[in-house]
Amino acid sequence: MISFKKMHGNGNDFIVIENLTKEHSLSKSQLIKKKKKKKGLGFDQLITINPPKDSNHDFYVKFFNSDGSEADMCMNGVRSVGAYLWEGALAPKKPLLLGTKSKPVLIRPMNSKKVKVVLDYPVQKEIPKSEAKFLERCGLKKYKFINAGNQHLIIETKKVFSYDLDNLSSRVRRRKFFKNVNISLFTKLPKKLELRTNEAGAGETLSCGSASAATASFNIIDKSSIKIISAGGELSLRKINDKLEMIGPAEFIC
């Protein structure tokens, strides 16, 4: 019997499993079965909390998408992991360093069911000319390719709901270069950004933390902050030198 908690971070839907004794292992087919909303548990990502691989880290966290693939990072997910550990008394209520497939992230407990994540500043990447021409044929002109733990194609538009995002994402991911890339649309509003994301392996979600980080990274200056609004709620992001701080909710469903 696997013990778990159903949680969400800004509407991003998770199953969180404590696996500190390494007793649990789920196959890809089992993950897909648990994903099914009517017969399974339903989730955007399934998260396992494991013993640290590095002596400097407190825990090692794995993220599995609803199609059974493993994600490199999930910012909304690490906040939920923090809440799980602190509320379950599995760790003292203090900052924790979590190892991930991508890179370690620092989490800090906040008030009002919120958690702060401190991460390395997202990095903009170059897109090969052939892929840039392909995006142009898709009608895309204003975009950035960003590594924020996961790879993100961030597209600026006047209205985030003006595109068929599922169709666009499917078309773009047929290219080998973009196969595992998260695809987002954003628009600039007064003092905030509106964001919509289709995650590789999970589809469109109510919120994506790493997409929010990627989008904020080229829209703020040092020691300033910005709010990211998605269908699931609001995240607050701030640039501090070479780090990006994210504050958002982490709540238990059942």
Question: What are the functions of these language-model segments?
Answer:
Residues 124-140, 144-149, 244-254:
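C-terminal domain-closing interface element
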Residues 1-111, 146, 153-254:
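A glycine-rich beta-to-alpha transition motif near the start of alpha/beta enzyme domains, typified by
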